């Protein structure tokens, strides 16, 4: 026989009895040798192995090996230590049991009935989450540009008289037409044109004893202090106050001096009688400095340097409309701007002689035309971009008087702002229902931009017929103050933007509050309309008590700019009482969800989200933020999808 056959036979004869015969002549299991028994062999090692990493998966492909009936897929997180994770016949494998950010190593071997091949060349893949989509809107925060946020911007008018559930207000104002002819000695006032020019005790309501002088004001301030609010009360500048409570006053030949008494700013100019908290009511005069003194006697320290809940004083109310609202005392000819400034200085000095630290608000313009032209004062010839508005004249007069007096005679430039924006037909303040058109919604939610935005032109008589362009009233006023009377503050003590029963009202009001804080406005008081306005009050809850308790927006504003201010704005703050805490209020005033990136402010910890939308509000009797749960944050960027027409508070700590 051939030599080779003899060698095979000898090998079989010497094989130990316990070794199975099928092993004889095998090339070794898994070693890639030649098979025996039938002349077959194990397949060769696979070639062309590739690994493609994706989000939470690694996809493998390789070339088929001749004679292979299947393949072993092997994996490890360190090179050269792979273990089998799958056996299959296909030449592709999707490994979806992986973690993003971890590198995985792979080899593949082929097998058939004769054995297993050697391993393929090793490959690796690192699955990663996909990058976030491009932001619809980018918000850029500059933490180096900051302003303190005044605690008095979260204000209202006649807090105690409001029956709706109130948010966490900080500031209350006793304002409105009623206070112009209020007589502190007897608590009578006149309604003016609001109600048949009626002399009555309207201001001395529940808990007020009209027989006690100044009780209408004392009870107002006391209630505010009990609620933790600062107060703004109105002092009488027009010149006449109600003598009685005997009903309507004739306007046929005003004023009827049998029904009114004369206001005197400084008692010592006409009388040597000392101040008293119980002045006679039979004389002809009512003294303003005595009024302030009496309030301090009743509520000691309210006009001090830094009381816990300060009381500020306002020099009357909307004097540029006295001939319309208070015909009974003013007549049909209004006070001139010159006389008004003179009277303001005289009253302010009389009050500050008594209380040097008193903070005084004026001129309390009713709106744009008062600021611009004193409602058509013939001594003024204002031009849109000129330094010849009533505001310029007022600031110059106050500056001159302050220099002579040795301190500011008016501390805060105060005006009212009932938005004049329209949808082309209807003014936003008249859009009060729960069903609004898209055009009406946009008119409301964009209207706050007229406070500051030099690129935004609302549709109103102001922009179309007077200025011929954007209003940006706060920017204009601040520039005039900086030029003429640096250091004077700004307040808006009555304002409305409509949408009281619609998410549009929530958005507009939240925007107002963000604007007030970011621009350093000193004080602001929302004017509650008649009827319901839960959606507007809800906006305060985005800044105050948004967690249903006492979590508030911070007290330092960070500069924020938006790549699409018509769609999304974000207001940013830090908290001096909690280092590292950052609070954002993000407003989407568009009708589509916006993926928003907020960049530039270092963040750490957890973001707690609270949100208001039309859908969430529709299920609530008291509209308020809904907790959306936590979100981990780090670095200096945060991304979030803001629902259409929504207000979202993001509290990072």
Predicted regions and their residues:
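Pro/Thr/Ser/Gly-rich low-complexity, intrinsically disordered linker/stalk tracts
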Residues: 36-67, 100, 113-130
């Amino acid at each position: 026989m051939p030599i080779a056959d003899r060698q095979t036979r000898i090998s079989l004869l010497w094989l130990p009895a316990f070794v199975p015969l099928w092993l004889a002549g095998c090339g070794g299991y898994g070693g890639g040798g030649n098979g025996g028994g039938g002349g077959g062999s194990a397949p060769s090692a696979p070639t062309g192995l590739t690994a493609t990493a994706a989000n939470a998966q690694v996809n493998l492909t390789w070339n088929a090996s001749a004679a292979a009936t299947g393949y072993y897929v092997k994996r490890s997180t360190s090179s050269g230590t792979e273990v089998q994770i799958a056996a299959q016949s296909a030449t592709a494998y999707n490994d979806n049991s992986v973690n993003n950010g971890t590198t995985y190593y792979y080899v593949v071997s082929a097998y058939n009935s004769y054995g297993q091949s050697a391993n393929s060349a090793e490959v690796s893949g690192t699955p990663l989450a996909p990058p976030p989509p491009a932001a619809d809107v980018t918000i850029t925060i500059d933490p180096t540009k900051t302003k303190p946020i005044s605690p008095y911007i979260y204000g209202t008018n006649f807090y105690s008289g409001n029956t709706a559930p109130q948010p966490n207000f900080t500031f209350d104002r006793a304002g409105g037409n009623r206070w112009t002819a209020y007589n502190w000695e007897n608590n009578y006032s006149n309604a003016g044109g609001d109600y048949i020019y009626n002399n009555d005790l309207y201001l001395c309501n529940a808990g007020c004893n009209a027989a006690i002088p100044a009780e209408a004001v004392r009870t107002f301030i006391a209630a505010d202090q009990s609620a933790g609010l600062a107060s703004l009360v109105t002092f009488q500048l027009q010149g006449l106050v109600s003598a009685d409570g005997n009903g309507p006053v004739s306007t046929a030949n005003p004023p009827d001096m049998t029904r009114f008494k004369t206001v005197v700013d400084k008692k010592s100019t006409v009388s040597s009688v000392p101040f008293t908290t119980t002045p006679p009511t039979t004389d002809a005069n009512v003294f303003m400095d005595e009024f302030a003194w009496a309030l301090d006697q009743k509520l000691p320290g309210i006009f001090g340097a830094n009381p816990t809940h300060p009381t500020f004083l306002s020099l009357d109310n909307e004097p540029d409309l006295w001939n319309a609202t208070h015909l009974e005392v003013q007549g049909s000819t209004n006070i001139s701007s010159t006389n008004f400034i003179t009277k303001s200085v005289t009253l302010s000095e009389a009050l500050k002689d008594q209380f040097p630290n008193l903070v005084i608000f004026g001129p309390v313009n009713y709106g744009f035309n008062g600021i611009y032209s004193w409602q058509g004062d013939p001594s003024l010839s204002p031009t849109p971009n000129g330094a010849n508005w009533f505001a310029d004249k007022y600031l110059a007069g106050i500056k001159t008087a302050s220099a002579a007096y040795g301190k500011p005679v008016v501390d805060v430039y105060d005006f009212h702002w009932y938005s004049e924006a329209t949808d082309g037909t209807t003014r936003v303040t008249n859009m009060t229902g729960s069903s609004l058109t898209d055009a009406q919604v946009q008119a409301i939610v964009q209207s706050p931009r007229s406070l500051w935005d030099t690129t935004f032109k609302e549709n109103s008589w102001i922009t179309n017929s007077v200025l011929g362009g954007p209003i940006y009233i706060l920017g204009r006023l601040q520039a005039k103050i900086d030029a003429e009377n640096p250091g004077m503050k700004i307040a808006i003590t009555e304002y409305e933007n409509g949408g009281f029963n619609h998410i549009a009202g929530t958005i507009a009001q939240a925007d107002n509050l963000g604007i007030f804080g970011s621009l350093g406005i000193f004080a602001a008081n929302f004017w509650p309309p008649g009827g319901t306005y839960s959606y507007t009050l809800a906006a305060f809850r985005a800044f105050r008590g948004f967690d249903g308790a006492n979590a508030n927006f911070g007290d330092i504003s960070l500069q924020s700019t938006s790549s699409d201010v018509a769609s999304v704005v974000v207001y940013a703050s830090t908290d001096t009482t909690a280092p590292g805490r950052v609070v954002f209020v993000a407003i989407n005033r568009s009708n589509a969800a916006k993926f928003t990136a907020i960049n530039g402010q270092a963040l750490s910890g957890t973001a707690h989200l609270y949100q208001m939308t039309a859908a969430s509000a529709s299920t609530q009797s008291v509209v308020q933020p809904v907790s959306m749960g936590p979100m981990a944050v780090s670095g200096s960027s945060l991304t979030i999808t803001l629902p259409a027409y929504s207000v979202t508070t993001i509290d990072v700590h």
